[in-house]
């Protein structure tokens, strides 16, 4: 078979095959590294058991919650596999967007998205980031095809995956008014907006019914140290080599200036670059407001790639920058050093303390391998916890913090219980005092004293005992 001819003739099959080859090995070993993934699985199991809607976390992610509640006891590789399929859909739709815009080498642009470390990893575990992006890419393509009602439906589904997808509305409005008269743009906006509003209202109706308007509430989190904010917004998104590639690409644009030969695209889609800039800017600002996770920047990635592709696709250096992006998931990473929840380092890793946290610069293992070893380490810790938990023979409270969802799901799956022990993510001063008055001993897992102070402004330093060293 002529591979070059096959790639040219069947680009979507190339995306499907590469998605399967690169994702399948990572669908096992639990539902991911995020506690939210395990909380989601527990939530959909309760929805299936009770028939009553429940949020996995505020403000609700009803598309994923309701779909997964139809397969609540599916093994990890099945639920993770759905994320793989939605990641595949997002990549295919981005390819179709780039092709619709008449950009050269649209498959290359799609592969850059596929191999972005944060996107790659998020398409291998049970979480909603790539689900939302898949529907956003569908909405974008449908918008370019002037299918306004379907654009609205796809946008509503994206918001039903992640409510922050509503940011897509701002560049959408600008795009419509740039490409048509105010009268036509207003009509098109109505055709998009009505189904989007109806779909969003329908999807969030269960949350509104059960929780009232309070379903939007979440407790405030402290702002992370600036080095961590920078890391999560750069290396955490693109990997080490991806950051090198982005810096090189931006410097090329800066120094080449007017000598650049931007791609020639379809003039019927004016305002696309402004569309991309707005999407990037809004998601960067949103991330800076609450820089908790690198994955919050996933919706900006297709638009960043579009801008790079637009200005650099005809530059000789672009092939080199693309090569760095494509290897970024597999080689070199900067990771947390922690025996229970950190990654396993290679022999060539170098450790350094940054902002009070020990981190490892690993010259061999890339982000996807490091993420896999984190998942395995967390599984080992939960197994170690359960072994110790089963041996407790006195009345005890264990504050589990961010480990709670991992532990609860594992115990539920293995039908493990100890009537002597109360497990909780955290407790207020009043709750702890009540248990102490009933002769309960207070234990906690490492680092969870910080969690309890953040959420409840209290931790019993003098009475609490570390459960596992």
Language-model features: locations:
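Membrane-embedded, lumen/periplasm-facing catalytic core of multi-pass transferases
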Residues: 40, 324-406, 410
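Transmembrane-helix motifs of polytopic, lipid-linked glycan transferases
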Residues: 13, 17, 77-101, 138, ...
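Loop-to-helix entry region of an early transmembrane alpha helix in multi-pass inner-membrane enzymes
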Residues: 58-62, 66, 73-92, 122
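Membrane-lumen/periplasm interface segments of specific transmembrane helices
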Residues: 187-252, 284, 288, 328-338
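Membrane-interface transmembrane helices that cradle and orient dolichyl/undecaprenyl
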Residues: 99-100, 137-150, 312
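Hydrophobic/aromatic-rich transmembrane helices and adjacent perimembrane loops
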Residues: 161, 167, 289-317
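Extracytoplasmic catalytic/substrate-binding loops of multi-pass membrane glycan-assembly enzymes
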Residues: 29-43, 54-67, 77, 378
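Short acidic/glycine- and proline-prone juxtamembrane loop motifs at membrane-interface regions
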Residues: 35, 121-129, 293-294
């Amino acid at each position: 078979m002529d591979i070059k001819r096959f790639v040219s003739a069947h680009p979507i099959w190339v995306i499907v095959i590469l998605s399967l080859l690169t994702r399948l090995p990572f669908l096992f070993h639990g539902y991911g590294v995020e506690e939210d993934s395990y909380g989601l699985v527990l939530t959909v199991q309760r929805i299936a058991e009770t028939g009553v809607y429940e949020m996995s976390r505020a403000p609700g992610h009803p598309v994923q919650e309701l779909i997964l509640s139809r397969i609540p006891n599916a093994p990890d590789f099945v639920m993770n596999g759905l994320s793989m399929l939605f990641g595949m859909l997002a990549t295919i739709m981005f390819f179709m967007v780039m092709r619709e815009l008449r950009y050269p080498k649209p498959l290359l642009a799609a592969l850059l998205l596929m191999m972005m470390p944060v996107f790659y990893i998020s398409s291998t575990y049970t979480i909603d980031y790539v689900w939302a992006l898949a529907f956003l890419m569908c909405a974008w393509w449908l918008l370019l095809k002037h299918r306004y009602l379907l654009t609205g439906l796809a946008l509503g589904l994206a918001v039903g995956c992640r409510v922050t997808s509503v940011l897509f509305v701002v560049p959408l409005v600008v795009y419509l008014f740039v490409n048509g008269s105010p009268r036509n743009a207003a009509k098109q906006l109505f055709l998009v907006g009505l189904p989007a509003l109806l779909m969003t209202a329908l999807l969030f109706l269960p949350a509104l019914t059960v929780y009232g308007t309070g379903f939007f509430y979440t407790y405030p989190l402290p702002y992370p140290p600036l080095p961590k904010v920078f890391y999560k917004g750069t290396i955490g998104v693109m990997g080490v080599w991806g950051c090198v590639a982005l810096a090189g690409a931006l410097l090329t644009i800066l120094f080449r200036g007017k000598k650049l030969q931007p791609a020639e695209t379809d003039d019927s889609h004016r305002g696309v670059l402004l569309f991309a800039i707005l999407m990037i800017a809004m998601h960067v600002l949103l991330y800076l407001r609450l820089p908790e996770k690198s994955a919050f920047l996933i919706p900006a990635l297709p638009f960043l790639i579009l801008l790079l592709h637009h200005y650099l696709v005809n530059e000789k250096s672009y092939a080199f920058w693309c090569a760095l992006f494509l290897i970024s998931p597999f080689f070199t990473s900067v990771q947390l050093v922690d025996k229970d929840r950190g990654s396993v380092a290679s022999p060539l890793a170098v450790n350094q303390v940054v902002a009070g946290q020990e981190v490892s610069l690993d010259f061999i293992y890339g982000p996807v391998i490091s993420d896999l070893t984190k998942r395995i380490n967390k599984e080992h810790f939960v197994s170690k916890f359960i072994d110790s938990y089963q041996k407790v023979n006195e009345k005890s409270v264990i504050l589990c913090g961010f480990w709670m969802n991992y532990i609860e799901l594992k115990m539920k799956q293995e039908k493990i219980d100890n009537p002597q022990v109360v497990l909780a993510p955290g407790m207020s001063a009043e709750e702890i005092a009540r248990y102490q008055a009933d002769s309960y001993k207070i234990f906690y897992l490492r680092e969870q004293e910080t969690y309890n102070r953040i959420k409840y402004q209290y931790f019993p330093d003098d009475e609490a005992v570390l459960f596992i060293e």
